[in-house]
């Protein structure tokens, strides 16, 4: 009993937060440490997005990734039992919205406004506790349309003229097929069930596909060979240059009209991000049922508030195109699976989560690591978006049950992918009300009827 109480009480209470420090409140997990060394390449994949959308040089983009990596640790530090990440499905929508502005201060201010509004939505939902109720009121056809639109945008962006598939067809093509096979194939799922080796490899998610890209890119001549720089070890973020170039305290705050213009996109982003809270709660619930020696407390309000803090800080210091989301589902699932094997495998869930995020922060700041993966970052980003497109379409299609919902979601998704979130949301809502007669969510209405009965 004493051991159980010890692991349950390893934190410093601070209101809704439960502060946990590495080595004091949880042990360093070697497995997650090694996984983080390899998976930090995905975090560095934000660099080409920042270079392309914001027009910042590589060194500035790299510095922004390091700052973002530090902020990831707020989740394990403040008691949120998940591995956080980008709001990945929203990346195509955000990129499409930002490219409507001219590159330079105007586009940066649009991103500042968007990230601050997204942060405020997270904060309001976290403080009020209304997230679940509000999202539940939105019809599934509209939510599906947003996800399908994000999926269409991701795939269209990679395969359109000038897209990364056209630049690196062999690398991206083979890497994407391998990623699809390892992440979604029924055959590979059977291979994992029958082989511990394939099971371990499968737990690394997209990493094997990225490693293949590192090999295929230079061999095919599409990408330069990795260049391992050993002269210096640690990259010190160029905070002064970031603030001078990107911070609203230097370039000025967005106008009121800019803040108003980002609201539809911000709403779409939050609707997408809300799915992460649902996924987080389910992953943690499953782990908590298996492990009775540690009470894992997932609080969606706390997760909303921490995500708000990250977005607000970045919006004021280094606006980040991929935004700050509450969950990296693939890694959280992998950590959770090892945690469920018992205390011998992982003492505390926070040990796996904290170790992974602290180690990815350290690794993205290591010059040899960043220099080695730099040449293949565009291809790695392309693989991420192509996989995300599949996931968005799969989840979106799974949400809709009737022919009317399918039609509305499809029309809305196409408009959203071509014209942006503002047009997509507007047309989706108008068509839904026109065909359905109201904006009520049939699922919510059915649940209310059952409760009354």
Which residues does each predicted region cover?
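Membrane-interfacial loop-to-helix junctions in multi-pass transporters
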Residues: 58-66, 142-144, 256-260, 295-305, ...
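Membrane-embedded alpha-helical modules
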Residues: 107-224, 350-453
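Short, small-residue-biased leader/transition segments that mark boundaries at the very start
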Residues: 1-7
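Hydrophobic alpha-helical segments of integral membrane proteins
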Residues: 130-138, 155-162, 232-256, 309-312
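Helix-loop-helix junctions within the multi-pass membrane cores of secondary transporters/permeases
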Residues: 15-28, 35-47, 78-147, 290-389
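Helix-loop-helix hairpins and the membrane-proximal interhelical loops
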Residues: 8-58, 194-198, 202-298, 448-453
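Helix-coil boundary and interhelical linker segments in multi-pass alpha-helical membrane proteins
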Residues: 48-62, 98-110, 159-163, 259
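Generic transmembrane alpha-helix motif of multi-pass integral membrane proteins
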Residues: 48-54, 72, 76, 410-418
